[in-house]
Amino acid sequence: MLLYTAKRILLAILVSLTVSALVFSLLYLSGDPATALAGERASQADIMAIKAAYGFDQPVYIQYFKWLAGALQGEFGESVYFRMPVIDLIVDRLPVTMMLGVSAMIFALALSIPLGVLAAMYPNSLIDRAALLLAVVGQALPSFWFALMLIVLFAYWVPILPASGSDSWQHFVLPTIVLGYYATPAFMRLTRTGLLDVLSSDYVRTARAKGLSPAKVLFKHALRNAIIPVVSLAAVQFGFMLTGSIIIETVFALHGAGFLAWESISRSDFPTVQAVLLLFSWFYIILTFLADLLNAWLNPRIRVA
């Protein structure tokens, strides 16, 4: 286990460095960042002053290492648009994003696990096919389109929920449904597949032969083992949810870190964009690393592979 953990740590570090290099390179995708920050009417003297202030006059590799060293210390510089430290902006917006992610995860698990259990208990039935249809639609439906449909339905046609904002719990209902529904199919399919495998195992057949009730066999023996892969997947999916929150928060005008990223992109606020993308990426890498360790602990064969 120690050797496997060391390998995963090394891989996580390499992936983190690669991601940081890609995020930093976004600064130069649109050309000279100093010119973009100065504006179209800026003089050459203004551009040179911005280059000196932000260190754009130094070699790119030096800029990268300085930026990475600052990022490791939580220092991302000052926001070009908001005129305040980037880390303070993110800390202020992050609770909204975390609240959305946690509520969406709870919604996804609460919907997918019962559906997966029913689909496994009644294979090839109407319930099973309805669950399969839900999975197909959930994977194929664009999240922004689904969000717009819910806004039209529940904020305008039947105005019972707000269309935008983040001041009360009502503002999180529609975003939670959209973000959680996108993750539901993966959990549902994994629950169904895992439960079908467990129900056909020898120890479950033995439990049935002992005269245990179907409910006791399901909840005490089968579901407890079938749900383990779902828990591992939840860690990875939570990282996906935080990344997907950029679109959802923008559509619903939730003032979280995802919406901050969109605001910063539209205003060419490079330091803030880089910080949000890097922190989201690192958080996802950490969750994936923890999920790998959990899988290896639960399934020793993974450590040998």
Residue spans of the language-model regions?
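A hydrophobic, multi-pass inner-membrane permease signature
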Residues: 138-146
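Alpha-helical transmembrane segments of integral membrane proteins
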Residues: 2-4, 16, 88-129, 143, ...
